[in-house]
Amino acid sequence: MAIKNRVTEMLGVETPIVQAPMGWIARSQLASAVSNAGGMGIIETSSGELDVIKEEIKRMRTLTDKPFGVNIAQAFVRDPAIADFVIEQGVTFVTTSAGSPTKYTAQLKSAGLTVFHVVPTLQAALKAVDAGVDGLIVEGSEGGGFKNPRDVATMVLLPLVRSKVDVPIIAAGGFVDGKTMAAAFA
């Protein structure tokens, strides 16, 4: 069943489900399954060299004709040319995380890519919007990855960020069933 909102319209997907870019797991097999189901599959770039990631992107294109994206986890970038590489691969959607939204946003956007940045706080959300991102991924303490012990829950952070910014938002962390997902849309 298709669900229309700002995220689905911006990303060209049927459902507002965006797969997490989990290290070592978010490769073409998982990402293509998510994209083929109508969501946004994401290939992670933090656990492989660029030639491995390039092969995953090539394989992705044989597994789906649906939209997909790539994540750049800045704290784990192995090659400083990662943004150039992503642009050269013809990817149209990038999520950035684990670093400053100012690092790659202008370069990616000037090449025509849509950029969302993962934020764990209101301050980070405001900084990302100021940097020009197209949207935010608001991830509370329940989300995966490295966490700060002062992080707050997604359902506390989400309405706060939503009240202060006017860009599309993807909620991340703590969604385990349809009821918890529906709460994020409220």
Describe each PLM feature range.
Residues 1-168:
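Active-site entrance/lid segments in N-terminal catalytic domains of soluble metabolic enzymes
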Residues 170-175:
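Glycine-rich beta-strand-to-loop/alpha-helix junction loops that act as flexible
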Residues 182-186:
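A compact, surface-exposed functional segment
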